[in-house]
Amino acid sequence: MSYNYVVTAQKPTAVNGCVTGHFTSAEDINLLIAKNTRLEIYVVTAEGLRPVKEVGMYGKIAVMELFRPKGESKDLLFILTAKYNACILEYKQSGESIDIITRAHGNVQDRIGRPSETGIIGIIDPECRMIGLRLYDGLFKVIPLDRDNKELKAFNIRLEELHVIDVKFLYGCQAPTICFVYQDPQGRHVKTYEVSLREKEFNKGPWKQENVEAEASMVIAVPEPFGGAIIIGQESITYHNGDKYLAIAPPIIKQSTIVCHNRVDPNGSRYLLGDMEGRLFMLLLEKEEQMDGTVTLKDLRVELLGETSIAECLTYLDNGVVFVGSRLGDSQPVKLNVDSNEQGSYVVAMETFTNLGPIVDMCVVDLERQGQGQLVTCSGAFKEGSLRIIRNGIGIHEHASIDLPGIKGLWPLRSDPNRETDDTLVLSFVGQTRVLMLNGEEVEETELMGFVDDQQTFFCGNVAHQQLIQITSASVRLVSQEPKALVSEWKEPRAKNISVASCNSSQVVVAVGRALYYLQIHPQELRQISHTEMEHEVACLDVTPLGDSNGLSPLCAIGLWTDISARILKLPSFELLHKEMLGGEIIPRSILMTTFESSHYLLCALGDGALFYFGLNIETGLLSDRKKVTLGTQPTVLRTFRSLSTTNVFACSDRPTVIYSSNHKLVFSNVNLKEVNYMCPLNSDGYPDSLALANTSTLTIGTMNEIQKLHIRTVPIYESPRKICYQEVSQCFGVLSTRIEVQDTSGGTTALRPSASTQALSSSVSSSKLFSSSAAPHETSFGEEVEVHNLLIIDQHTFEVLHAHQFLQNEYALSLVSCKLGKDPNTYFIVGTAMVYPEEAEPKQGRIVVFQYSGGKLQTVAEKEVKGAVYSMVEFNGKLLASINSTVRLYEWTTEKELRTECNHYNNIMALYLKTKGDFILVGDLMRSVLLLAYKPMEGNFEEIARDFNPNWMSAVEILDDDNFLGAENAFNLFVCQKDSAATTDEERQHLQEVGLFHLGEFVNVFCHGSLVMQNLGETSTPTQGSVLLGTVNGMIGLVTSLSESWYNLLLDMQNRLNKVIKSVGKIEHSFWRSFHTERKTEPATGFIDGDLIESFLDISRPKMQEVVANLQYDDGSGMKREATADDLIKVVEELTRIH
């Protein structure tokens, strides 16, 4: 068997649908966004969109509509999933807790029926009498809406018109009436039917219209007073209501296809339209009032408002704000202005919602050489195309930096007690202290009266009674604010030097070697309260007040040399409350008591970058739940700071980290800076909510990005990226991309817009000796769109496009690899292409081109003609392995720098994907699942080892280990095949057994080995083997890792128990959602653990946790089974969350 754990590292980001209404209350305006399996609920405020709740559905959201039946005070939500689970949801809030209640649910799948090519359509009658669904050709399904019905029951009505393009319910009809566009051999037509609930039949509708535009694709039902429907086509927009027929053909809409629409006004006088090029239009219905007071339509008008992201859906929010939901680019709320700007646009983007989808390809690289992978994806399409650099951690935006080597500490000050913001920064150096005055964004050096500047400062700050304090190696100095003067000074009785110190607003603890002294701060006086001797020298200490102790800390935390211990002492007596031996040789360098999400912790960092953290009881001073993580390799300094009103800790070291709490568990996120030795929070007029950071040579002031798990940087390329690879020697990425050009009158083509391939620093064009340009059998016509393919060379540091190489006309670049070949010392970019002509069923010729990029120049080293499309290429034992149509071929690289065929394997339909390990080759086929080949170096040929005989239409493949192979197929499933080495007969051995099945609910485009987290983080006891990342069409990034059998069994048990405790939204069974499902078969999931479900354990209440662990057997590593506690499982799950 094979045991795997699959989990989401980045939730889907592509927006598939959006609606607006009054869901959370009658007064709120809500925006609901569907991102595949996730539903996000926002409330529209004057400041912008405020997130209320995010709901994970057990299904892909196919239909999402708000409606309000009679007797309801606010809107209800109807959702239908791709596996035909229907539910009606209601928002309930009591105090802090928010629940999404399932009012009614049911599955509306038919046992037979052909799913419609135009997808699932779900509509609701405006009077809320019924829900209509078009799921299968020739059938219209009706769900009657009864208030009391807990179960959604549906019936089918036969529809003679098999090929329905779009359907809507009309407004203002006595009986529910549908209006639809359908296609038959004669063309496209519009028809209406009344739906009779009693007879469960269609009755003749009020009107119909034969032979509308051949490309008519959308129906918009218009509310009263107009009524009727608008039909939108490629070139024309028409209005019908039985009496009135009006058609317009504005040239402006011809360039592209309109794909979405949304009503602006309740009376239907204005509609927003969005097209495939990202243009936003307004459709206006002009009215005419008749003598008898009725209103009829006078005219239709279309106006271009401007350009947005390419819209998948549009919804009008309020006050001229429209939400543009995008699948191919970032989504954005946009403001519609009355007047146009200089570019003639009426649209302004207000903010952007990052979308990684569709992830077409990706690679993992460690650019910073820090042992941490970054994921670089080819994301988006057309003008929304971009590269996304995704790393685990937090970004800091630099606002100012000053060259100041040797900083040993820094603190913010308010020089005037009445100020709200900091205006001074105190910097400490060996043997001296300097003071910087902040004036707006200007920084100048100054002197503070009462402060000494010829000694190193250990602490400095504003303290009680409007005073300042400076602790230096010689003394503790209390300075009055008005006037600035020294009012009290404490020195060690024998005038010894202070070694470490800590201070809060009214308490000071200093250490002099082994001696500890406790002082209190009074008006104009430092009062020594107590002192004690420890058995070893004090290495670090802290007196941060926790809880509601009025700024006084009853505890003091210290770390000692020699015995390497952390201790909690009681103040003022210095009585020992708890002693924790840390073990090892390395001394504690920094200790900190802090509170995250109302839980108290003690953090203790050692000189080698290790960090211990404990739960701290502030009443007793006892430590519990000892845990250890490795943050860096250098001594670590811990400092607290606040961000968005929550406390976080910054760990300064060679790998700076922010420690924060999420769902009552600590999260360690690294920061995108090389090293930080010291930091302090800074909130000045010129630099609000900032951080001051010092490394060996520089002082930097910056602000921190929103604290979250992943940091995403966008590099727009404004065309479609297809493939990416990294080349270390040239410090570049190679990217295959394609831009759209339009045939002009002269027979040439022109680009639609500037993009990466037209804006590169240098460029070149293929001229092939293999194909003469006149060989093109295909003539394009005026106005036709053609794809132009390029290889882009992109700098790994600046992401500048250094070079763009354009391929031949009709030549599609399909595969890309960077590698060395044979004994040749050079590293090459190699591109596989196909010549694509519309009249050919599959490509008959293509080429493999070998490029070398060095010294800023791209040279073509070799090219090889092939008889087909080069779908995939990998470097294989110093040779080049390629799949060409149905053939897998191995090329060797000769001394003459030519590719020579060594051997072939022919038994495929279409070999799309190749992965290798050692001498093994995994081939992913278009429709025949996966195949395992072995290369025999002695014979110089391929041997077919085994294949999966199930028909799977593959979208990506990966080798997990020597015996297990991962596949993703086009019905959103994952599966694992296993080589059966122990089989007795040859026939059994030739079968790859499907040992893992799982419904991911995402279309996977790419798998790659790698991880987004530091590889040595924490002493983990959860053995996960390997890490494969996956990228999907919806911008979701997932991770698959292998488990041992015992861990799999524990997690499977836990998964089953969680399913009993966690109630799913829409009452969809988890086992139904995750079952492997294709048109051919449905089988229960096996061999996979649903990591998202396991991780949800951390979000449930303590009593529910107890319910899950009741009688659960658990082996804590001692080999003995015992009953698990909730804390055992919390530890296990927390460790699992750290793998992504």
Curated annotation (Swiss-Prot):
Region of interest called WD repeat beta-propeller C, as start-end residue ranges on this chain: 709-1043
GO cellular component, one term: Cul4A-RING E3 ubiquitin ligase complex
Subcellular location: Cytoplasm; Nucleus
Keyword Endoplasmic reticulum: no
InterPro entries according to UniProt: Beta-prop_RSE1/DDB1/CPSF1_1st, Cleavage/polyA-sp_fac_asu_C, RSE1/DDB1/CFT1/CPSF1, WD40/YVTN_repeat-like_dom_sf, WD40_repeat_dom_sf
Positions bearing N-acetylserine: 2
Region listing for Interaction with CDT1, in residue ranges: 2-768
Modified residues annotated as N6-acetyllysine in this record: 1067
Record region (WD repeat beta-propeller B): 391-708
Cross-link entry Glycyl lysine isopeptide (Lys-Gly) (interchain with G-Cter in SUMO2), positions: 1121
Residues where Phosphothreonine is found: 1125
Known pathway: Protein modification; protein ubiquitination
Self-association and partners: Component of the UV-DDB complex which includes DDB1 and DDB2; the heterodimer dimerizes to give rise to a heterotetramer when bound to damaged DNA. The UV-DDB complex interacts with monoubiquitinated histone H2A and binds to XPC via the DDB2 subunit. Component of numerous DCX (DDB1-CUL4-X-box) E3 ubiquitin-protein ligase complexes which consist of a core of DDB1, CUL4A or CUL4B and RBX1. DDB1 may recruit specific substrate targeting subunits to the DCX complex.
Family as reported in the entry's similarity comment: Belongs to the DDB1 family.
Name used for this protein in its record: DNA damage-binding protein 1
Gene: Ddb1
